[in-house]
Amino acid sequence: MSYSCGLPNLSCRTSCSSRPCVPPSCHGCTLPGACNIPANVSNCNWFCEGSFNGSEKETMQFLNDRLASYLEKVRQLERDNAELENLIRERSQQQEPLVCASYQSYFKTIEELQQKILCTKSENARLVVQIDNAKLASDDFRTKYETELSLRQLVESDINGLRRILDELTLCRSDLEAQVESLKEELLCLKQNHEQEVNTLRCQLGGRLNVEVDAAPAVDLNQVLNETRSQYEALVETNRREVEQWFATQTEELNKQVVSSSEQLQSYQVEIIELRRTVNALEIELQAQHNLRDSLENTLTESEARYSSQLSQVQRLITNVESQLAEIRSDLERQNQEYQVLLDVRARLECEINTYRSLLESEDCKLPSNPCAITNACDKSTGPCISNPCGPRARCGPCNTFGY
């Protein structure tokens, strides 16, 4: 906010410079508008000629108007300054608690989110460890299953080989039984043929000859055949018993192996079913944990995006407030400088008023015609007058109030 003091022209006019006695300091006067008033013109003329030239009333009226305008501007600036201070105080009281509260809530929310993130990370690590353990267990069970499957295949191949051997032995037994039956039939046929031939010979030779021969007794063929038959039957029976005993032993062993293999196979099948159920349950749990992790990651991403946008908004708000505060500070500094300038102007005006008041009080005195008489009159307070009447004003008492 800028203020214009409404002063007269700030530059020195030619009204001073047109006088032959005006010093160079008049062109660089420090008081705004000091060279524009008739009093300053009469000052130059007064120091040179020692008279008022009849413009005291006009000068006093002009000075009074200037003083009133300056005082009004000073009061206006003081009121504006007070209003600005109240406005700044109200804004600071309104905004500071809001910013602090919002920061505290954001910090609490960020800490809660960080705790949730840490808990989620630990839970994910625990689930990863459980998944790794389940994978190792499933690999172990898979290895056991493959081993037992290879053992089962070996046992099944052995059973198939024993079944082939059993079939061969069964065929062998049937062949031997068929051979025994054929031998029995052949033996029976031989017996019948032999009996028929013996009977035929007996019939032919029974009534014709009666020859007695002193020789060794004849061999009984029936007895020989019976002995041979009994020997063959005993041999066949022995072979049959041995084959049956061996077959029974092998069959019993195979049955035991088949029973044990079937029991192991059933136990393996039950274990495989349980392992499949466990693997399915672990896969379902793994998929659920993956979904939970994805949802948590999405939630975390959304929360980070939301809170980052909120933080950016808060940062922008803080930046705006800081820029406003900087502008307000700069305005306050500028107004303070203007206020100091106005105070200086006021002090100089008061000094000038006091000077003119002293001049008005001493206007009844007779002024001498000597140009330096007035300076000799005020020599009591300021010292001796200088030899140059048109020198710088700082050497004269009444003009020393301008601070030159």
Swiss-Prot record:
GO terms for biological process: epithelial cell differentiation; intermediate filament organization. The record marks 305 as: Stutter. GO terms for cellular component: cytoskeleton; intermediate filament. InterPro entries: IF_conserved (IPR018039), IF_rod_dom (IPR039008), Keratin_I (IPR002957). Residues 57-91 are annotated as: Coil 1A. Residues 220-363 are annotated as: Coil 2. It comes from the Eukaryota. There are two types of hair/microfibrillar keratin, I (acidic) and II (neutral to basic). Belongs to the intermediate filament family. Transmembrane segments: none annotated. It comes from Pan troglodytes (Chimpanzee). Residues 204-219 are annotated as: Linker 12. Residues 1-56 are annotated as: Head. Residues 56-367 form the IF rod domain. Keywords: Coiled coil, Intermediate filament, Keratin. Coiled coil: none annotated. GO terms for molecular function: structural molecule activity. Residues 103-203 are annotated as: Coil 1B. Residues 92-102 are annotated as: Linker 1. Residues 364-404 are annotated as: Tail. This is Keratin, type I cuticular Ha3-I.
